[in-house]
Amino acid sequence: MRFVQKIAQFIKEKELDLGALTIIVPSDRAINKIKQELSNLYSIPILSPQIITIDKWMRTEDKSKIDPTRQLITLHEISAQLAPFKDQSFEEFLSWGNTLLKDFDEVDRYLLDAKAVFKNLKSIKELETWQIDDEELSSSQKKFKEFWGHIPELYTRFNKRLQKDKKTTSGRAYRDFNDAIIDEASRLTGNHKFIFAGFNALSISELSVMKKLIDKKCAFFLSDADTFYTRDSIHEAGSFIKKNHEFLNVDYPIPLLKSIDNKKMNITIVECSQQIGQVKVAANELNNLSVEEQNNTLVLLCDESLISSVTKNIPANIDKTNVSLGLPITQTAIKSWVDILFQIQENKLKFGTESIYFYDFQRFINHSVTLSCTSIQEMYLLGDIERDAIKKNRIFQSIEAIKISDLMSEVVGLTFENWNKDWKKALSNIRTLNSVIIKNISKENSFERTILQVFDESLVELQNIIEEGIPEMNQKSFKLFFDQHWSQKNIAFKGDQKEGVQVMGLLETRLLDFKHIIALGMNEGKLPATNQINSFIPMDLRAALGLPTTREKQGLFAHHFYRLLHHCDTLTATYSSNNEQLGPQEKSRYLLQLELELQRINKNINITNKFYNVPIEKASSENAQVIEKSELIMGRIEKHFNRAISASSINTYLRCPLDFYYRYIAELGEEKSIEEDIESQQFGSLIHNTLEKLFDKHALFDSLGNENIPKPRALEEVDLNQMLIDYKALLYNEFLNYFDNESQLFLEGKNLVSYTIAQDTIENTIKKELEFLKKQSEPFYIVQVEAKKEISLDVLVSGQKKTIHFKGYIDRIDKIGDAYRVIDYKSGKVKEADVKFKLKDNDLLVSFTNCKHAVQLALYSLFFKHSFGAYPNEAIIYSLTDVSKMDHKLSYANHNLTDICELFETFIEEVLNEIFDESSSVEHNEKSKYCNYCQ
């Protein structure tokens, strides 16, 4: 017989008057069950007794309970009147205010003398700071001592204020109810009876109330326990039960069970390598249940963070499900939405601009809350703005630019308006924003509407508090204050408590019994929970005062768990061994106790250990790094080579054919984003651009090859000395343009280092040029800078002539006397092997691959020949970061540049024949780094 049935049986056997009976239970879930059992037991219509939770029963009707946020504000107002706390900021107060309120609550709940408790605490703290010598205490040590000395006064003033406002805390309500219980009992009719059913861990105030009624012979105390754990003096599951009966001086009106010792039960313990694996195990178990079994099945969430995954993975065969513990709103998109709203304000303060920081804009437009009220057209327009910002590296975005519709204008205005530390305005904006979004959320986004509504409802009381006035605080403090208020809210699920699979947390299961239990998250640290007790009262003093210590806090879960075994036939318990999750990866001690203790005593218990790994679906191809050249892909290759190609595309193919395929054939490009910190490529571009502007005015031809008029004279020392003056303004403008006119982004922090290095690099380069110029006996001309070049080469591919077009930009062409040089700037280091060409085993593909810059310099030499009729005398890489060895010339043993260029044309033909070979596949080069698409 289940415990709720025994309660009903007890009432009937005692012939208790249902109209003069109050049944007090630990939680709401048991109320309907008891009513149902009473209805089943009595064959005639009955008047239901009052059935109420102990928390509701012990609240005084003349005082309303004050919420935690108001408690905090009230305590702060009181503390500000006392000398040690007058100069404290609200942020400093937050570091201790919540903890002290919890201690006040426990002192009341356990009927302790507050003055004595905090006097003891003061003595302990003084001992901790006691010094053996006579050295005078520092000012901070004096403040520390004063703090502990004023806690009793804080407690007294706080309670007087509550009394004046006709408010109460949970703990104070329990203390007051204990004082008034005899009057309350006398107020009821003479034969009124009370039943306290299914309690485990109780505070002194609760026990004291019960004892007073039991001593008056008008109350019964009914425990749901088994001799397996009550007869053992050290078993934690029975410790509270025995203490309760000793304190109340009562026996067991409902005899203890003797079930766990000899009952049959199948226990399966499943180790899961992934957190989600536990949910999959539950889904598999539920899938095998009959309809009858479903009505007797509990999914127990020892790790309540699994609730969202569990509700999404309930199999289709489960007719009815009731989820009782609620989805914490912090496990929804609201948490990240709130973080975005506050981060926007944080960055407004940080950057001192009314514009929108790009990453705030990006997070905002891609967040599910924004998307839930955004039309398809608005999404496209916002996406265009995002892509344009990335293309132009626009770190800050104009607010007006994203007001693309009436709705978006309103949403953007409310989201990005400056709060200016006006918290009344901040909350008003957030609530108005909630209202606008809720009103415009599409039908298919009903979940987003629900979470926003729950979030908004939680802010109503906070808005009232702020309207009444709150202390001055900074944004960080307001965020803590704000989060504390809304983060405890849950989203209730709809369901039938009478039928179907029940999904609960451990506390909701009190008084309820199930035949089939699926317990998820049974890791040590989750069950029992190892949450630290947040208290100023040390553990040894807590133990001496009778306050719960960590041991008691953990021990109360033991009875809740073992009680579920009373009527259980099958238990499937999972735990995660995933190293990436927070907390221990071991199975709960309760599972170890079942294996090591219970199985030894009860031979009818069958325990099986299993391992579950989420199956990984096989990919469509055995090797994802292989692309076969289908007709479609060959068409794309043909299309690519019908356009002009660059040296970098050929080099990409040499490094990794698969990278070449993704970037140039599939045209995925590279993942782009806004860069706040200058990467090497962009850093080099800014230096290149500055050098181009410095030398362009001295060039004989413009970038397209048109002759500049008037014709510039040869470069002289005076020109380079002027460059040493001009470069700073040019470089500054390059950086300013790159950072979208936000100079503070490169005049401080990490980017200032890059800016300084860029200045040094250009100055050293010009000085090196000046040194080089002084050594020349013939005129030095700048022929062209950033020269745009194109050529076409005819090659044989699979026996057929194919014309390949090349394009590129030569950083600089210069002339000393009659000798021409083509120069490419590199902001990185250059090795000798990068420009020293070696023909290895007559394999041109390997040879050009091994000489990093050979393809580029050979192609640039061909560009030069096409424009000027002959090859240049030298093809050079300028290493801007190593001025000691700045010019690195392309060389080939005893050969000249012409020989390399002729080999290059043959090499291009070989590369293209390999690329156009339909029988070969595109594969990743194992020696190459993986690109984003190969990973």
Where are these regions (language model features)?
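Accessory/regulatory regions of helicases
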Residues: 358-363, 431, 523-644, 871-873, ...
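Accessory helical subdomains and C-terminal extensions of nucleic-acid helicases
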Residues: 81-115, 136, 292-294, 314-321, ...
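Conserved helicase NTPase motor core
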Residues: 130-240, 271, 515-516, 687, ...
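Conserved helicase core region in the C-terminal RecA-like lobe
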Residues: 53, 193-202, 484-533, 561-579, ...
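Accessory C-terminal helicase-associated subdomains
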Residues: 139-163, 190, 287, 401-508, ...
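Basic/charged alpha-beta structural segments of nucleotide/phosphate-handling enzymes
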Residues: 25-188, 204, 380-386
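Conserved motor-region signature of P-loop NTPase helicases/translocases
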Residues: 1-48, 54-56, 183-353, 512-513
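RecB-family 4Fe-4S metal-dependent nuclease core
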Residues: 518, 574, 581, 623-935
